[in-house]
């Protein structure tokens, strides 16, 4: 299934007002196989049956424990879609994945992608915004839908100064590299402490996210509090599980960041439900990631136990 908030947008939740389904846009999905990969046999049946206008691939894992999809895997998925349903467009939700590998999905047949500028592509500097990239006609179609026909991307909400977008985009590859180094260190340390982590420190990475599975809510919540405590902003604030729009379960979030809501910076969040997995993102600098995660582990695994 799509991640929680997308289920609301599509119209899979009880309230349908303003959703894609209410607007007459049909939706179907193919459950993943037991390994978290694509069930190509079932996907072929659905593609031939529906001949969809757009096939959506979510690169990152969202609030799931499957592996995020690499660019090579997306390349294979795209070739499969184009073979079975040649008229279908392929769209990739590229959030958390930009600059994590040498190549991007649009280099391998993906028609267009989108992502957030308060994640990888904004380099930790952009204050807000998102991007759409791909075939010119599709980008223009998105702009027309966002504003109005005849206006398109010539108008729209933006900041008075574009400096943050340009500088952030320039720094994004380096900042993403720092974040990935921080996650590799975190995975190695937390696995040594007995935590189940995915991906493991030595496994290939295609995004910023490090999943830590605690199996009990108490450790998950306490570790989240330690992430907040070791953040540069609002380190005195104590996160607690709370109801959030778009989610069925309570969610806990640690995000003591310079840019509100930024997951390019050191942060962690997750729904309070089994297997009590926390999704951690690091961070603007490897130096801070290493200090913060070491402090969090020290407090959770040593000081709590005397």
Swiss-Prot record:
UniProt-listed InterPro entries: Met_g_lyase_put, PyrdxlP-dep_Trfase, PyrdxlP-dep_Trfase_major
Pfam family, one: Met_gamma_lyase
Family the entry assigns: To L.delbrueckii similar ORF in glnA 5'region.
Protein's name according to its UniProt entry: Uncharacterized 33.9 kDa protein in glnA 5'region
Organism phylogeny: Bacteria, Bacillati, Bacillota, Bacilli, Lactobacillales
């Amino acid at each position: 299934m799509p991640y929680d908030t997308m289920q609301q947008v599509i119209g899979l939740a009880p309230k349908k007002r303003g959703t894609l389904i209410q607007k007459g846009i049909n939706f179907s999905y193919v459950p993943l196989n037991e390994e978290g990969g694509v069930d190509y046999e079932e996907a072929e049946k659905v593609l031939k049956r529906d001949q969809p206008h757009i096939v959506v691939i979510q690169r990152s894992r969202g609030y799931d424990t499957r592996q995020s999809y690499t660019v090579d895997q997306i390349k294979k998925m795209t070739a499969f879609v184009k073979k079975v349903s040649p008229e279908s467009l392929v769209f990739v939700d590229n959030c958390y994945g930009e600059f994590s590998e040498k190549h991007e999905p649009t280099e391998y047949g993906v028609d267009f992608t989108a992502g957030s500028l308060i994640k990888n592509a904004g380099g930790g500097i952009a204050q807000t915004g998102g991007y759409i990239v791909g075939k010119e006609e599709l980008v223009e179609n998105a702009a027309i839908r966002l504003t109005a026909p005849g206006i398109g991307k010539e108008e729209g909400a933006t900041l008075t100064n574009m400096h943050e977008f340009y500088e952030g985009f320039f720094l994004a590859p380096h900042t993403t590299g720092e974040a990935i180094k921080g996650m590799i260190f975190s995975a190695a340390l937390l696995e040594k402490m007995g935590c189940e982590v995915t991906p493991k420190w030595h496994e290939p990475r295609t995004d910023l996210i490090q999943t830590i599975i605690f199996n009990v809510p108490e450790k998950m919540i306490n570790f989240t509090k330690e992430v907040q405590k070791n953040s540069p902003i609002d380190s005195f604030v104590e996160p607690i599980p709370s109801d959030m729009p778009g989610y069925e379960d309570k969610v806990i979030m640690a995000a003591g960041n310079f840019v509100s809501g930024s997951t390019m910076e050191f942060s962690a969040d997750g729904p309070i439900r089994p297997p009590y997995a926390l999704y951690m993102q690091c961070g603007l600098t490897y130096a801070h990631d290493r200090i913060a995660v070491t402090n969090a582990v020290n407090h959770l695994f040593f000081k709590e136990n005397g």
